[in-house]
């Protein structure tokens, strides 16, 4: 079957737009820290959630370059893409290697009154993530895993009213999601600190941080542990759809 060049162009455009929208809609921020130098931590999603590095050092790490924190931080301006509401699903994944200091350490936080999430190390050196509506504060831990690289994942499934924590791809805790009030705030996002004023600082290294506006499956989390970050390949380069798209169109029309 033959078709006009204009019709073919339209088909290609529609297919690529569908591919891009389905691959990019779910990942709202992704920091690979592969820049290796400079004061910018670029967001690999389409949302432009780039961060500014304040003092953290670029070093070799788990996958290529990583950021090492010694009472330093990255500031990401507030954005609605990760300012999750009280009824919104979301997931967070990251690689972490931290020091056991017997004190609070802010890892990834949007903290100001109620908050949609905070990843933190507590004084027992346990890594966890929590949500707060200024009354209820559900959180899920993975224990003291300091001193070596580990993959941490936190998942909120609002339909099930559950939150989950994973360590190296394995489920650690399942807790009730008791949130019933506002979690949104106007705070910026800090990587390596808690909040404005740069209190509750982090000591360690971080890599491959990704935030999603949906529930990640256990299979996807295991894939991330193996280095395959869900949704990232197409979010970073929408053109990667094009080869498959064009191949399918050629089969159909020629």
Locations of regions flagged by a protein language model:
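Extracytoplasmic low-complexity segments
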Residues: 2-72, 173, 222-254
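Extracellular glycan-recognition modules
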Residues: 28, 32, 37-41, 70-128, ...
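Short, flexible loop/turn segments at beta-strand junctions in immunoglobulin-like
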Residues: 142-144
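Residue-level structural signal for beta-strand termini and adjacent loop
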Residues: 177-178
């Amino acid at each position: 079957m033959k078709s006009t060049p204009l019709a073919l162009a339209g088909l290609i455009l529609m297919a690529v737009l569908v591919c891009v929208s389905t691959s990019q809609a779910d990942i709202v921020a992704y920091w690979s820290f592969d820049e290796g130098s400079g004061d910018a931590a670029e967001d690999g999603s389409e949302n432009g959630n780039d961060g500014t590095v304040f003092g953290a050092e670029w070093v070799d790490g788990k996958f290529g370059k990583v950021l090492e924190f010694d009472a330093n931080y990255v500031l990401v301006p507030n954005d609605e893409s990760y300012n999750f509401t009280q009824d919104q699903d979301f997931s967070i994944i990251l690689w972490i290697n931290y020091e056991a200091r017997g004190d609070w350490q802010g890892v990834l936080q949007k903290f100001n009154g109620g908050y949609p999430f905070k990843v933190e190390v507590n004084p027992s050196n346990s890594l966890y993530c929590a949500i707060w509506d200024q009354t209820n504060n559900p959180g899920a831990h993975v224990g003291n895993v300091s001193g070596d690289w580990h993959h941490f994942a936190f998942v909120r499934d609002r339909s099930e009213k559950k939150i989950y924590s994973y360590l190296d791809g394995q489920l650690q805790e399942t807790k009730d999601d008791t949130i019933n009030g506002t979690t949104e705030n106007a705070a910026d996002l800090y990587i390596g600190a808690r909040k404005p004023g740069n209190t509750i600082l982090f000591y360690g290294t971080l890599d491959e941080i990704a935030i999603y506006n949906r529930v990640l499956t256990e299979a996807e989390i295991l894939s991330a542990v193996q280095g395959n970050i869900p949704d990232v390949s197409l979010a970073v380069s929408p053109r990667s759809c094009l080869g498959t798209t064009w191949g399918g169109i050629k089969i159909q029309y020629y």
